[in-house]
């Protein structure tokens, strides 16, 4: 491959390997020959052949420094050691030698731990820098790890030297009674990393106390969330409260909420005893979804007062804060876990109703305003299951889930009211009908269009007979 006369070609390896060590110890110790001078004169930092550093050496033996020949390259490859190779070869052998014999160490931190180049004793400049930092931080003369690294790079000392210097300086100031910082309950001879860890623990405890003070001032839905569930937190104070991770036990405002709701425990004892008699222990998968997440997740803004009234008016819907948490805590609020856990535990027990009445009837009977949501919110499912569930059996594997939820009266398909003034909302009679139906609820029924409530439960068809006509769902 030929290049023009004035083209200074260098391989990519030669630019990185021969430009910097040209003035290093290895290059100065070796005999200065024509090929070494010419490769250095053609480097990136001295591209001109007439540069002052190499004029005397480069002019001998060649008519011009730019007369490149193949025999000169072969002679250079044969006659020089591996770390000073020809700029024309691929540097497969010269690369490792040059990297291992680099006289400057790494670029990030030039003085390594076992490198003999770092200073064993601190100079006046280094101690002046450390003293300046100490004078600026007299109230807290404990540098962090990042500050120690910064000071070590500036003063060209190691981290051990910097830590030892600060420990000695603090001990010296303590002996001279010039302490301007709060003493620590530990000896100064211990490692400084432990001091950093204890200081970070103190800062985290202060932040936790500040967080509890601010979270105690939170108002609105956080009080109801903490009273209803055992592990939900008040994230912000503007009304949008998010549920915690399932692994967290209680959030910061849980203790204050327990204190505030202790006066309600006496009133709730009777309802809680009735709940324990009627219903099995409630699963965790259904606790944060009753009356709390439904108003937050409802698409219509009118559904919020109905869900809020369902969470506020009956005292039985609140579990006492002192109740022991259940043993199983799933990590995800998945639909499958809700279905599998609630099949064996059908009733949540929001009030002292009859055992045959399903859990869906009580939140619906707590009072839905006429302008409420057109679709009822299930107490076990926080999100609205509108009308897509009849087709789960056709397209997905949710057929068993659909049948099970319909058997409990959790999926209700309401009809259009006879009078135009009424709106579509959850009816207790429909819920009780579906609950009393039992095993017959899985059969397909047909009633005349003038009839009342028609729960369409046939999952094999593409439309449901609702009210006065046929409405297609696809």
Curated annotation (Swiss-Prot):
One of its GO terms (molecular function) is sequence-specific DNA binding. GO terms for biological process: metanephros development; proximal/distal pattern formation involved in metanephric nephron development; specification of loop of Henle identity. SMART domains: HOX, IRO. The modification Phosphoserine is found at residue 187. Residues 196-210 have a biased composition (Basic and acidic residues). Residues 293-305, 358-373 have a biased composition (Low complexity). Keywords: DNA-binding, Homeobox, Nucleus, Phosphoprotein. Expressed in specific and overlapping patterns with Irx1 and Irx3 in the developing and adult metanephric kidney. In the adult metanephros, renal expression is found in the loop of Henle in the S3 proximal tubule segment and in the thick ascending limb (TAL) of the distal tubule. Residues 262-275 have a biased composition (Acidic residues). Residues 115-177 bind DNA. Residues 177-220, 262-373, 420-461 are annotated as: Disordered. GO terms for cellular component: nucleoplasm. It is found in: Nucleus. Belongs to the TALE/IRO homeobox family. PANTHER family: IROQUOIS-CLASS HOMEODOMAIN PROTEIN IRX (PTHR11211), IROQUOIS-CLASS HOMEODOMAIN PROTEIN IRX-2 (PTHR11211:SF15). This is Iroquois-class homeodomain protein IRX-2. The gene is Irx2.
């Amino acid at each position: 491959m030929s290049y023009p006369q004035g083209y200074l070609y260098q391989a990519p390896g030669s630019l990185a390997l021969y430009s910097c060590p040209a003035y290093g110890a290895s290059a100065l110790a070796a005999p200065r020959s024509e090929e070494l001078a010419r490769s250095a004169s053609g480097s990136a930092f001295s591209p001109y052949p007439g540069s002052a550093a190499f004029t005397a050496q480069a002019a001998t033996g060649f008519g011009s420094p730019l007369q490149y020949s193949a025999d000169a390259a072969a002679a250079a490859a044969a006659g020089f050691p591996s770390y000073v190779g020809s700029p024309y070869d691929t540097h497969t052998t010269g690369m490792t030698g040059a990297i291992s014999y680099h006289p400057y160490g790494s670029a990030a931190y030039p003085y390594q731990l076992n490198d003999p180049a770092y200073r064993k004793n601190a100079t006046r400049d280094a101690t002046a820098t450390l003293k300046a930092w100490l004078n600026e931080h007299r109230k807290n003369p404990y540098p962090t790890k990042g500050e120690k690294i910064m000071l070590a790079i500036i003063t060209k000392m190691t981290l051990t030297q910097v830590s030892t210097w600060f420990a000695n300086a603090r001990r010296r100031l303590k002996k001279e009674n010039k302490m301007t910082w709060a003493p620590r309950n530990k000896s100064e001879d211990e490692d400084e990393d432990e001091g950093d860890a204890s200081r970070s623990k103190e800062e985290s405890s202060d932040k936790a106390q500040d967080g509890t003070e601010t979270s105690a001032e939170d108002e609105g839905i956080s009080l109801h969330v903490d009273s209803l569930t055992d592990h939900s937190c008040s994230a912000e104070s503007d009304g949008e409260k998010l549920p915690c991770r399932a692994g967290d036990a209680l959030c910061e405002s849980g203790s204050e909420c327990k204190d505030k709701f202790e006066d309600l425990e006496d009133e709730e004892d009777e309802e809680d005893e009735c709940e324990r008699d009627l219903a099995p222990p409630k699963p965790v998968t259904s606790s944060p979804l009753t009356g709390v997440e439904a108003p937050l997740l409802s698409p219509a803004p009118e559904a919020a007062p109905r869900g809020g009234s369902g969470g506020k008016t009956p005292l039985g819907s609140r579990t006492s804060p002192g109740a022991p948490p259940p043993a199983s805590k799933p990590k995800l609020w998945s639909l499958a876990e809700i279905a599998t856990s609630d099949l064996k535990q059908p009733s949540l027990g929001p009030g002292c109703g009859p055992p045959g009445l399903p859990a869906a009837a009580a939140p619906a009977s707590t009072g839905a305003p006429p302008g409420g949501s057109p679709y009822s919110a299930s107490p076990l499912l926080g999100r609205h299951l509108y009308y897509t569930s009849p087709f789960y059996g056709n397209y997905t594997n949710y057929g068993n889930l659909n049948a099970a939820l319909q058997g409990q009266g959790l999926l209700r398909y309401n009809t259009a009211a006879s009078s135009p003034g009424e709106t579509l909302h959850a009816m207790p009679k429909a819920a009780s009908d579906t609950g009393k139906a039992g095993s017959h609820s899985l059969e397909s029924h047909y009633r005349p269009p003038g009839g009342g409530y028609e729960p369409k439960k046939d999952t094999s068809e593409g439309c449901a007979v609702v009210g006065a006509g046929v409405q297609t769902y696809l």
